[in-house]
């Protein structure tokens, strides 16, 4: 949906990541979704960002991006500081609290590490960030400030934007694909 009707409209190649319970997404190349050999491409949450955790863990997602960068990860990290904050809205309503802001900033560091890896691998013109948590302006502001220091200068041109379609992206994408088959 984002490729045709939203933030990716008119872009030839871009990545779309969704942060929620986990981290998933899509790779768009030449205005087409890249599916991979088993139609499973875009499992960005499975990228290993913490090798020591992966090597010592037993769960397939130990040490992986979504364990540290998903909205679920943020809520879990915040619960160690204030268990009464159980969702993104509550967390960002308390962002002025130094202890909350510190945890949020560590979480954004995790997001940026994964994004920098993906930017270096795919060299997209644009990265679209979706999921309910990504409507918080502070997150995108911080990502814009941090990405240039995390990527090689030849990759710093990448545009990073919020998804525009919210929860309608999947439905609109399915509609578009079905209409192309008719």
Spell out what each predicted region is:
Residues 4-12, 49-182:
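ATP-binding/phosphotransfer module of carbohydrate and carboxylate kinases, centering on a glycine-rich
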Residues 11-64:
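Glycine-rich phosphate-binding loop of actin/hexokinase-like ATP-binding domains
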């Amino acid at each position: 949906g984002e490729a045709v009707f939203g933030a990716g409209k008119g872009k030839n190649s871009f990545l779309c990541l969704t942060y929620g319970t986990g981290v998933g997404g899509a790779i768009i190349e030449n205005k087409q979704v890249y599916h991979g050999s088993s139609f499973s491409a875009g499992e960005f949450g499975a990228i290993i960002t913490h090798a020591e955790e992966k090597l010592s863990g037993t769960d397939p997602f130990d040490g992986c991006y979504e364990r540290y960068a998903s909205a679920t990860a943020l809520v879990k990290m915040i619960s160690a500081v204030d268990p009464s904050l159980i969702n993104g809205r509550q967390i960002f309503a308390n962002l002025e609290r130094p202890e909350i802001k510190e945890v949020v900033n560590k979480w954004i560091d995790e997001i940026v590490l994964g994004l920098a890896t993906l930017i270096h691998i795919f060299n997209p013109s644009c990265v679209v960030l979706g999921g309910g948590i990504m409507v918080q302006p502070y997150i995108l502001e911080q990502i814009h400030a941090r990405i240039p220091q995390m990527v090689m200068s030849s990759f710093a041109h990448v545009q990073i934007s919020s998804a525009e379609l919210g929860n309608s992206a999947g439905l609109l994408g399915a509609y578009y694909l079905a209409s192309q088959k008719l």
